[in-house]
């Protein structure tokens, strides 16, 4: 089996386990559903375990992907995206670490990436905020950048897009956690007076005509980040949705909800988005 075929097999096994997360599935059923041998299933399971996935196994019951797993994966995100928004899961690129998800997304946009293409990383080595300020991006966070095409959203000015993304993230956090984040200024989300999320919007235009070609929306969320390890100058000003390793939901689920919200809100008018934004905005 080639490396490419092996990767496809592993991805299919992971996708099957994600869609049955928390319950046992037999190796025979998995093999039949995917169209591979039971031996190939066994090899894929071992490879996934070596990557850190907690997969339990019991004789005569099969395999179960533990609910405790919180590894970001395209398969995991896709398992939480509803059928109406399936196209938002067609171009997910997940990395353990990148310099900047916005940089990766811009590279993809310049190569003609589709609307909704999403770059996601567990860590950024050179994360950026507005005015090129450093955005501290350790493990425990969600770092994602979405490519948006102007003909797919009802507005194109950076501030309007920032508001649109801010509302999408707020609504996702509200619906999944019950928390009520507010938008401080225009591009930062706060909970209980401390920053939980930053947003960076960048765009590219055709040189001769100045016509907008693409927009990249960068989102950085402290999910279950260890705030104690943040730089001293940040510790008192930031918070995390959950304590380290104790999230009540998976990162994949929150990412999926944000992508669904982007898809839904893109069909709204700028007036409607502004109304939702204003409800959540507070002055610094």
Model-derived regions, located:
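N-terminal lobe of the biotin/lipoate ligase/transferase fold
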Residues: 2-174, 197
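Short loop/edge segments at beta-strand edges and connector loops
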Residues: 96, 183-185
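Long, positively charged amphipathic alpha-helical accessory segments at protein N-termini or as interdomain linkers
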Residues: 2-36, 50, 151-181, 191-284
């Amino acid at each position: 089996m080639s490396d490419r075929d092996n990767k496809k097999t592993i991805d299919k096994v992971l996708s099957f386990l994600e869609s049955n997360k928390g319950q046992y599935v037999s190796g025979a059923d998995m093999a039949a559903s995917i169209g591979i041998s039971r031996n190939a299933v066994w090899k894929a399971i071992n490879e996934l375990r070596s990557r850190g996935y907690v997969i339990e196994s019991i004789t005569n019951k099969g395999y179960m992907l533990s609910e405790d797993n919180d590894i970001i994966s395209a398969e995991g995100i896709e398992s939480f995206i509803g059928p109406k928004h399936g196209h938002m899961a067609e171009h997910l690129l997940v990395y353990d670490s990148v310099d900047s998800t916005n940089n990766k997304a811009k590279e993809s946009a310049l190569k003609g990436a589709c609307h909704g293409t999403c770059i996601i990383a567990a860590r950024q080595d050179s994360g950026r905020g507005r005015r090129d300020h450093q955005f501290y991006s350790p493990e425990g966070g969600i770092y994602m950048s979405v490519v948006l095409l102007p003909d797919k959203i009802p507005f194109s000015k950076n501030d309007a897009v920032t508001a649109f993304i801010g509302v999408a993230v707020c609504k996702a956090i509200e619906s999944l956690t019950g928390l009520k984040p507010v938008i401080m200024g225009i591009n930062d989300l706060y909970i209980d007076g401390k920053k939980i999320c930053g947003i960076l919007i960048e765009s590219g235009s055709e040189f001769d005509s100045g016509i907008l070609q693409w927009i990249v929306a960068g989102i950085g969320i402290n999910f279950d980040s260890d705030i104690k390890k943040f730089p001293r100058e940040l510790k008192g000003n930031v918070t995390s949705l959950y304590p380290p390793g104790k999230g009540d939901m998976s990162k994949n689920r929150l990412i999926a909800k944000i992508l669904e919200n982007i898809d839904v809100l893109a069909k709204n008018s700028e007036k409607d988005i502004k109304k939702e934004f204003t409800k959540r905005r507070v002055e610094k």
